[in-house]
UniProtKB/Swiss-Prot annotation:
GO terms for molecular function: DNA binding; zinc ion binding. This is Zinc finger CCCH domain-containing protein 51. Residues 14-150, 283-303 are annotated as: Disordered. Residues 29-46 have a biased composition (Low complexity). Residues 56-68, 114-125, 140-150 have a biased composition (Polar residues). PROSITE patterns: ZF_C3H1, ZF_RING_1, ZF_RING_2. The keyword Membrane does not apply. It comes from the Eukaryota. Keywords: DNA-binding, Metal-binding, Zinc, Zinc-finger. A zinc finger (RING-type) spans 312-350. A zinc finger (C3H1-type) spans 235-263. Gene3D superfamilies: Zinc finger, CCCH-type, Zinc/RING finger domain, C3HC4 (zinc finger).
């Protein structure tokens, strides 16, 4: 099969200048030409003229031949339905139908299963919806409950009869007298006590005021507090000043808010832990039928006795009036004093003794036990 040949035609118009128009021509295998042209022009009155020659074929054969399209149209808008003029009237109906279809799609199918949710209920009722957490005011006056903070202590003398009230009245009368107020005849003959006389220097001395006399105690005891409210705080874990505990010195001094204590102690949790461990050991030994408390005590006492020396480190003889130094070394009293006159340090560890020799009660106790055993043996 021979390939198709495309030719060009010239379209001429009677009323307009000559223009070029695209006309599809195909040539069949036997040489006959096929012409497909657009019979309409832009002006409407144009005539199409065929200016090419297509061989020896007649025009009747050309009209009877089937037109073949060479260029393939794009298929992008193949599935798009073009809107016709008659569809304008049915626009409103189509919109209503589409909305009905959408509403029908959104309707959920009934489900018999139970579902639980923490969100608000979607059921609509006649009552208006309220938020989940809503608190209404009771619209009442707040109950006055001060827990006894305004209670008054009535065990003391009444404030209008105590020493301070008497002194205030005396100073008030003296103030009136200094201002030149006239006195009654009955007032001059009435004795008002040693503090009732007119003080002509009251305006020049500061001590004639209650604020300055309170500390001096010139008008009796101070008033007790009428309103008492005690708050106690138990600090089971006091904050220790680290600087003072390690060095014995704190730059803040007495104003330091932490406790100044250099003692070593165990916190509560550590004490409880040790007690629980000891209880576990005791219960285990009790279940096994073993009593280790007495045995351990005997072992500890034996170890302590074995740790004590049996003779003086200097004279290598049994102790005579044994003494012990700060470094826990035992000597005879005579040997220790004699060595101290020559050397101020310990004979064993060469540490300063500071001249301190305490009585060795452990050695004396052991010597007494040995003496009693020897007497019983005799």
């Amino acid at each position: 099969m021979e390939p198709f040949v495309v030719k060009e035609n010239i379209v001429a118009s009677a009323s307009s200048p000559m223009k070029k128009r695209r006309i599809d021509h195909t040539e069949s295998a036997d040489g006959s030409a096929i012409n497909a042209s657009n019979s309409s022009s832009i002006g409407g009155n144009d005539t199409v003229m065929n200016m090419a020659e297509f061989g020896n074929d007649n025009s009747n054969n050309q009209e009877s031949q089937q037109v073949c399209t060479f260029f393939k149209k794009p298929t992008k808008s193949k599935n798009i339905r073009k809107r016709t003029i008659d569809a304008d009237e049915e626009d409103g109906d189509s919109k209503s139908e589409s909305s009905i279809l959408q509403n029908l799609k959104k309707v959920a199918k009934p489900d018999s299963n139970l579902y639980f949710s923490s969100g608000p209920s979607t059921r609509t009722s006649g009552a208006p919806e309220r938020p989940v957490f809503h608190y209404d005011s009771s619209k009442e006056i707040q109950v006055q409950n001060d827990s006894g903070a305004t209670a008054t202590l009535e065990t003391e003398t009444d404030f209008n009869q105590d020493a301070r009230a008497i002194r205030e009245r005396v100073l008030k009368k003296a103030d009136h007298a200094l201002k030149g107020n006239k006195k009654k005849a009955s007032d001059e003959k009435l004795y008002k006590g040693i503090h009732g006389y007119t003080d002509h220097k009251a305006g020049f001395r500061r001590e004639q005021t209650i604020s300055s006399e309170k500390a001096g105690g010139s008008h009796g005891p101070l008033r007790a507090s009428a309103h008492i409210r005690v708050s106690a705080r138990f600090d089971y874990q006091p904050d220790i000043c680290k600087d003072y505990k390690e060095t014995g010195y704190c730059g803040y001094g007495d104003s330091c808010k932490f406790l100044h204590d250099r003692g070593d102690y165990k916190p509560g949790w550590q004490i409880e832990k040790e007690w629980e461990e000891a209880e576990k050991v005791r219960k285990r030994n009790k279940a096994m039928g073993v009593e280790d408390d007495d045995d351990e005590a005997d072992k500890d006492s034996d170890e302590d006795e074995n740790a004590l020396p049996f003779a003086c480190f200097i004279c290598r003889e049994p102790f005579l009036d044994p003494v012990v130094t700060k470094c826990k070394h035992y000597f005879c009293e005579h040997c220790a004093l004699k060595h101290h006159t020559k050397n101020k340090k310990c004979f064993v560890c060469n540490q300063p003794t500071m001249g301190i020799f305490n009585a060795a009660h452990e050695i004396k106790k052991r010597m007494a036990e040995e003496r009693s055993k020897a007497e019983q043996g005799l």
